[in-house]
């Protein structure tokens, strides 16, 4: 392949990647506002600045696009948990995980709300992911946390319930953002409130799992 051909291929690849990113971003905005059934592909295409035909070239159906958006959300959420290793200091690792999950709630509130909508609907389009890769990851990390408990590095708690509690307390600030703002007058976009939230959620959870 000539140097010119390589440059052309690289340019085309970047253009495709940018177009997919624009479509996924527009899909997240639209699905989180109108839900799966209330969203039309024409809306997403217009917001992404592409034709419907072009959109369908990359994502063959509304369902395929919706699932791609949800998988992207899961990848963002689960990355910090995937990084857990047995040699980590447990309390420090869990404190950092809480901070990272709150950063996700701050930076991707629409993603959190869309995922919540899918769960409330019974996860009809995401159940394979939940019972497959997600369950495998939770099983793996629960066993790791159970090892920390057994070695006395954490109080005797159930690992799955710990993970659920972290998810619930951190995602609340995105899923119920209007309620949080109505009560406190602030959102996670407020730096002072964000830091207070991190410190309080960390303290409440860490003090509950600290070995006595």
From Swiss-Prot:
**Which residue ranges carry the DNA-binding annotation?**
39-58
Q: Which BP terms in the Gene Ontology apply to this protein?
A: negative regulation of DNA-templated transcription
List, alphabetically, the InterPro entries matched: Homeodomain-like_sf (IPR009057), HTH-type_TetR-like_transc_reg (IPR050109), HTH_TetR (IPR001647), Tet_transcr_reg_TetR-rel_C_sf (IPR036271), Tscrpt_reg_pyr_util_RutR (IPR019915), Tscrpt_reg_YcdC_C (IPR013573)
Q: Which residues form the HTH tetR-type domain?
A: 17-77
State the UniProt keywords alphabetically: DNA-binding, Repressor, Transcription, Transcription regulation
Looking up Pfam families in the UniProt record yields:
TetR_C_3, TetR_N
Recorded GO molecular functions are: DNA-binding transcription factor activity; transcription cis-regulatory region binding
Which cysteine residues pair off into disulfide bonds? none
Which function does this protein serve? Master transcription regulator which represses the degradation of pyrimidines (rutABCDEFG) and purines (gcl operon) for maintenance of metabolic balance between pyrimidines and purines. It also regulates the synthesis of pyrimidine nucleotides and arginine from glutamine (carAB) and the supply of glutamate (gadABWX).
- Share what the entry says about its subunit structure, partners included: Homodimer.
PANTHER family attached to this UniProt entry: HTH-TYPE TRANSCRIPTIONAL REGULATOR RUTR
Protein name, per record: HTH-type transcriptional regulator RutR
Please give the organism: Escherichia coli O157:H7
């Amino acid at each position: 392949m000539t140097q010119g051909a390589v440059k052309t291929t690289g340019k085309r690849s970047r253009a495709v990647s940018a177009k997919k990113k624009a479509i996924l971003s527009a899909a997240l905005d639209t699905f989180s506002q109108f839900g799966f059934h209330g969203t039309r592909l024409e809306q997403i295409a217009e917001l992404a600045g592409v034709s419907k035909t072009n959109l369908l070239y990359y994502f063959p159906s509304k369902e395929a696009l919706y699932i791609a958006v949800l998988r992207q959300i899961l990848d963002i959420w689960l990355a910090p948990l995937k990084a857990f290793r047995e040699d980590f200091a447990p309390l420090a690792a869990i404190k950092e995980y809480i901070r990272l999950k709150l950063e996700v709630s701050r930076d991707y509130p629409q993603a959190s709300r869309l995922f919540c909508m899918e769960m409330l609907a019974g996860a009809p389009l995401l159940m394979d992911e939940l019972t497959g890769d997600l369950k495998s990851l939770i099983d793996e990390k629960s066993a790791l946390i159970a090892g920390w408990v057994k070695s006395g590095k954490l109080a005797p708690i159930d690992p799955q319930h710990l993970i659920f509690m972290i998810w619930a307390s951190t995602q609340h600030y995105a899923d119920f953002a209007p309620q949080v703002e109505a009560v406190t007058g602030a959102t996670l976009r407020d730096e002072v409130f964000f830091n207070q939230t991190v410190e309080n959620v960390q303290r409440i959870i860490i003090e509950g799992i600290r070995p006595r």
